[in-house]
Structures are given as structure tokens and as C-alpha cells.
């Protein structure tokens, strides 16, 4: 086997990637400089961007011709709907993403200055509500997958159990 080839044990030509992890909406403001403590400054640009470590991994895998299933949890809000739409548009299976009726979708408030230094406030919201139901989805899908991707934006004990 060539060192650049992945061992793929399914009949597909594409790896099957199972991602169990964070789904967050990034709220990004670009500024000339970081504000001082207690100071309000004017932002130069603002935008929202789908993200979270898990969602970002899923999109990257899908764009590299992998079949991808995403497992996690979002809130029943506009950010959750937007994240699901983004993942579906990237051909990612979202059937196992739970929707929490109480917790909000995870967010990252990101301030980026003109030298690309940033500060981030992460509110994990529904990501921290991942539970046994999502873990069961991982266990049921793991035989399908060649690769299981995990990270730390969901409860740590669930990542450990999934591994």
C-alpha cells in the first residue's frame, strides 16, 4: 500500500467518517484593536459563521470526498436551524443530531483585530446536553465508519465512552 493511501475496509471508494462533537455558531467581529477593560469600541465588520470543532471536521471531511455522519446536539433556535442547513448543504448526514428544546445552540463570540489576534468566548449550550441518546447513535454507527472523530466541545465522559 502506498503511504498516501488510507486502508478502507468498505466497498466504497470514499472513507466513511463519523463525527461526534460540537456544533456552534460563530459570531465574529473584526476590529482595528482589542478594547481595553470597560471600553466600548466600534467594530469594522460583523458576520456569523457555522462552526464548532465537530461541524468543522465534518465539513472538511465531506469536502474531501468522504461520506460523513454528524452526531451532536443543537438548540431549537435560528442558529441550530442554520447549522443543520449548512451541514445538509455539505452532504453531511444530520439524522443523528438532536435538537434540545431548552438549551440554546452553542455559540462562539469572536473578536479579531487587524493583526489577526483573537479573543473567543465559547458558550457550549446544547453541546453540553449531549447524552446517552447521542452515545447510542455513535455505537450504532461506529461499525459503518472507517474513522471516528471526537473533540472536547461535548461532555468529556461521552467522548471517552465513544472512543
Where in the sequence are the language-model features?
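Short, glycine-/polar-rich solvent-exposed loops and beta-turns at beta-strand/coil boundaries
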Residues: 101-103
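Ribokinase/PfkB-type carbohydrate-kinase core domain
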Residues: 2-23, 73, 84-99, 110-163
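Glycine-rich phosphate/adenosyl-contacting loop at the front of the ribokinase-like
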Residues: 2-73, 78-82, 88-92
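Short alpha-helix plus adjacent loop in nuclease-associated cores
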Residues: 105-108
Amino acid at each position: 500500500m502506498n503511504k498516501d493511501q488510507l486502508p478502507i475496509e468498505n466497498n466504497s471508494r470514499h472513507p466513511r467518517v463519523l463525527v461526534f462533537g460540537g456544533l456552534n455558531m460563530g459570531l465574529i467581529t473584526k476590529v482595528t484593536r482589542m478594547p481595553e477593560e470597560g471600553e466600548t469600541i466600534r467594530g469594522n465588520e460583523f458576520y456569523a459563521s457555522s462552526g464548532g470543532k465537530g461541524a468543522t471536521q465534518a465539513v472538511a471531511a465531506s469536502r474531501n470526498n468522504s461520506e460523513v455522519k454528524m452526531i451532536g446536539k443543537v438548540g431549537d433556535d435560528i442558529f441550530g436551524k442554520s447549522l443543520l442547513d449548512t451541514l445538509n448543504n455539505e452532504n453531511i448526514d444530520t439524522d443523528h443530531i438532536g435538537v434540545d428544546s431548552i438549551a440554546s445552540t452553542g455559540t462562539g463570540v469572536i473578536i479579531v483585530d487587524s493583526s489577526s489576534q483573537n479573543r473567543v468566548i465559547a458558550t457550549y449550550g446544547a453541546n453540553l446536553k449531549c447524552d446517552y441518546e447521542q452515545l447510542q447513535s455513535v455505537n450504532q454507527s461506529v461499525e459503518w465508519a472507517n474513522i471516528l472523530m471526537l473533540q472536547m466541545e461535548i461532555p468529556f465522559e461521552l467522548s471517552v465512552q465513544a472512543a
